[in-house]
């Protein structure tokens, strides 16, 4: 687990102008490129991280520590602690009432991906139940499978996506349930041939958001959402988006 302080706050921001309540929250994330990940020096970066830093500026909040940890740990803390913000969190129907939300960071296609040479054949979702499927523990990929009635005994979980990818390439699982964009980015970063991988089924299309512990006040979430909305409409966000999604 690594904790790093974000970029310095703007010099003109004073304590009187600051948003002390947003500064009392604990900001958690995972390795999930290109939305949030560690750079070469180990500091958090990515589209969602830079978006969050811009929100802090808009709300006159001093830059806060961001803690990177395995997703399952962050998700557990989100459910147990009163002052956690976890990102980038897919806002599914099952999760929606559990937390409070500021959206969107972006949108994701959650898919079942396997090896192109695999004999996997899926004509309907139920066909996938006979295969061994890998997923990141407590990630939306795992939760969507469970919500659709898949046998948890046939879902092999990993702490991080690179571990799940290794399970796929070594033949331990037939498919991975994950975010298509993040998976393709990981494949490229490991210098694997993307032609060797194939999407066999799309499970869902979901918003990525900042999820707040339920005890966080509605007013505070509203303040954060207002800052987020301003950033999303700004030229700064267009530059951030072009940096991490250059093809868009």
Could you tell me what each predicted segment is?
Residues 76, 88-98, 174-195, 200-204:
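A ligand-binding cleft/hinge motif common to bilobed small-molecule-binding domains
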Residues 29-31, 108-111, 189-225, 247-248:
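Periplasmic-binding protein-like
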Residues 46-59, 139, 210-240:
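Extended ligand-binding regions for polar small-molecule ligands
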Residues 114-133:
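Flexible hinge/capping segments at coil-to-helix
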Residues 19-97:
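Extracytoplasmic small-molecule ligand-binding "clamshell" domains
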Residues 67-68, 72-84, 100, 127, ...:
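Short helices/loops that flank or line small-molecule/ion binding pockets
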Residues 62-65, 140-156, 195-196, 228-248:
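Ligand-binding clefts/hinges and TM-proximal coupling segments of bilobed small-molecule sensing domains
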Residues 13-18:
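N-terminal signal peptide c-region/cleavage motif recognized by signal peptidases
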